[in-house]
Structures are given as C-alpha cells and as structure tokens.
C-alpha cells in the first residue's frame, strides 16, 4: 500500500490558516500586525452588505463594516486573500441548494466586479 504524504505550499508538513469575516474596519489594523510577522490569511467578504459611503456608527459599535471604496483600498495593498462568503451573509444551512449556490456565486461575481481578484 502506498503512503500518502500531504504537503502544503513550500513543502511544509503543517499549516495554520487564519480567516476573518465580513469586511470590518478592524481588518486594517489586523493586516498591519499580521504582515509585520509574515502572516497571511483570508478575508471572507459579503458584497451585499457594504454600508453606504460616509456611514457613521454610534460610539461603542464594534462590528463596523467598511464601505466599498475603503474596502478596496485596505485589501488591495495587502497580501491577504479575498474570498466569497455569501452575498447577504445568509445561513446557507437552511436554504434550498439553488438559493445557497446563488448566494455564493453572486458574492463571487460582485467581488470580481469591484476588482478583488481571486488568488
């Protein structure tokens, strides 16, 4: 019986995956810290949930999504990967298969339209 040896990029036997959701303002600081230590990861973005330009949040709001123009600037200058998450952040578990597929495919299409390239 043949042995199967799994390897990650660069021939590494192990890998750590970092992934973050939703395109929030805190991602900009996270990118700076991670890149200082040579870390990379994936941001899972919901393109149907971008707030309007000029949005303001109440003091103390923690989950502050970035508007589209800021999101493009923040992620374009990073070495992190952008991934489709679901267009409206719907729970895919309870959706019919065709609706779940539409959530993912529409998100992917929108992210490509705004210049977020797949890597």
In which residue ranges do the predicted regions lie?
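N-terminal pre-catalytic segment of deacetylase/amide-hydrolase enzymes
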Residues: 1-18, 72
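Metal-dependent polysaccharide deacetylase catalytic core of the NodB/CE4 family, i.e.
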Residues: 37-119
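Generic hydrophobic alpha-helical membrane-span motif
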Residues: 27-28, 91
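Active-site-adjacent substrate/metal-binding segments within catalytic domains
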Residues: 18-24
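A short acidic, amphipathic alpha-helical/loop segment
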Residues: 29-33
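Short, conserved clusters of charged catalytic residues that mark active-site
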Residues: 25-26, 66
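Short, glycine/acidic-enriched loop or turn micro-motifs at the edges of active sites
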Residues: 24-25, 88
């Amino acid at each position: 019986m043949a042995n199967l040896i799994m390897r990650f990029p660069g021939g590494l036997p192990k890998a750590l995956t970092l992934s973050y959701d939703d395109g929030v303002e805190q991602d900009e600081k996270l990118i700076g810290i991670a890149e200082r230590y040579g870390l990379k990861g994936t941001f899972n973005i919901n393109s149907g949930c971008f707030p309007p330009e000029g949005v303001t949040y109440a003091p103390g709001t923690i989950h502050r999504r970035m508007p589209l123009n800021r999101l493009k600037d923040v992620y374009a200058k990073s070495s992190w990967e952008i991934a489709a998450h679901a267009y409206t952040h719907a729970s895919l578990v309870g959706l019919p298969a065709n609706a779940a597929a539409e959530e993912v495919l529409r998100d992917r299409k929108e992210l490509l339209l705004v210049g977020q390239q797949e890597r």
